[in-house]
Amino acid sequence: MDEEHIALYPFASEVSAYVESLRVSLESLLNSPAFRRSRVRGMERVMQSIEGEIETTLIKDESWLLSETLSYPFAQILVACVDDQLFTKRYALKEAEAASKWLEKESTDFLLEFGEDFGIQAEAEELQFSMHFADYIRFSSSIREPVWKLTNRQLRSGMVVVTKKDFVRLLQEAIKERIEKSFPIPKIPSEVSSFCAPYVAEIKDKFEVHKKKFGTTDFGVVEPDLFPPCISHALANVQGGVNLAHSMRFAMTSFLLSVGMSVDEILNLFNVSPDFDAEVTLYQIEHIAGATGNVYKPPACDTMRTYGNCIGKDRLCEKINHPLAYYEKKIYLKNKEKEMEKEKEEKEEKEKQEEKKEEEEKEKQEEIKKKKKKEKQEEKGKKIKEGKKRERKQEKETKRREGKEKQEEKKRI
């Protein structure tokens, strides 16, 4: 990938190696006047992601290439410091949309190579692209328009045929997914947070104004780690190629739909099952999702026990009566823990700052003491010096007087 493409697609895998080769330290990126343009542009792309579209103007000079490339890691630092899940999703979406506009102008060969960076193995013939249906489902599942459903696509020997425009749209989803997964950034140094604080305050103020315009789901991002044991067990079996009983398949599917997973995402989970049939499975999932007008809810714990699907019961299970209640409680506890951790970090940071302030004050007082001691010693030395000077003067005067007296004595004799 040449420097121009690196600047346009800074989230590509090989860009990190290029940035490392520039030998620009984090401290330099944050503080050096040489990278002021990168910081300004980084803040600009973050603010533009809130306001509407991230605009990129291709200039093709060395200065622009450097500032545009380094503006991305600076923007990432700002997004990480904001630490808001909805904002992160918004930023990732707008970066992906901005990139897709440039991808539309790229050659077929470049698009195929670019797709490989995201694990998409595709082929192209004339103006059409073909890709494996699993890759198609992975990146199309978050697109809600009916035209993107697998049943509405041309399928040939497990390969989905799409136009160049649609292939670029899928690449956009791949970019969005990669950027979202790059957050949160663990353990941001306190000095970085302090430096970014004014930027972050401005970003948060702007985001709060626009927040109501952005959509979100009831549960937010789906978090499989927080699923109840019964659903986690079912998922592990499905991914291991084990064929689930009908009642467990229904329970798992209805649960996943309820927490925000799309039909195509769930379909992709079942594609390793020994009896997998894409059309039949898709029909079953859509039926549970409400294709016939009746949306099915996941069964309660009592029903799960009746059918022998209550597996791996833990302590939290004793306090709830529905798998969704388990998931809600886990999300609450995680958010509470995160909030407490944040408060703890803020408290530790505050204590650290106070200790630093006390230390600085102590050092300041020590400096004052040293200065006073030095001044006292200098004053004492000065007095001693002046005393010795007076003694020498008196001694000299005494000798002069004695000499004069001797001369007068001689004259009298």
UniProtKB/Swiss-Prot annotation:
InterPro entries according to UniProt: DNA_primase_lsu_euk/arc, DNA_primase_lsu_PriL
Cofactor, free-text remark: Binds 1 [4Fe-4S] cluster.
Cofactor(s) for this UniProt protein: [4Fe-4S] cluster
GO molecular function: 4 iron, 4 sulfur cluster binding; DNA-directed RNA polymerase activity; metal ion binding
Cellular component per GO, a single term: primosome complex
Lineage top rank: taxon: Archaea
The UniProt record lists the keyword Metal-binding: yes
Chain residues that bind [4Fe-4S] cluster: 230, 301, 310, 317
Pfam families (UniProt xref): DNA_primase_lrg
Keyword Coiled coil: no
Record region (Disordered): 340-413
Compositionally biased tracts (Basic and acidic residues): 340-356, 362-381, 388-413
GO biological processes: DNA replication initiation; DNA replication, synthesis of primer
Keyword annotations: 4Fe-4S, DNA replication, Iron, Iron-sulfur, Metal-binding, Primosome
Subunit structure: Heterodimer of a small subunit (PriS) and a large subunit (PriL).
PANTHER family (alphabetical): DNA PRIMASE LARGE SUBUNIT
Family membership: Belongs to the eukaryotic-type primase large subunit family.
Summary of the function given for this chain in its UniProt record: Regulatory subunit of DNA primase, an RNA polymerase that catalyzes the synthesis of short RNA molecules used as primers for DNA polymerase during DNA replication. Stabilizes and modulates the activity of the small subunit, increasing the rate of DNA synthesis, and conferring RNA synthesis capability. The DNA polymerase activity may enable DNA primase to also catalyze primer extension after primer synthesis. May also play a role in DNA repair.
Name the UniProt record assigns to this protein: DNA primase large subunit PriL
Organism the protein comes from: Methanosarcina barkeri (strain Fusaro / DSM 804)
Name of the gene: priL
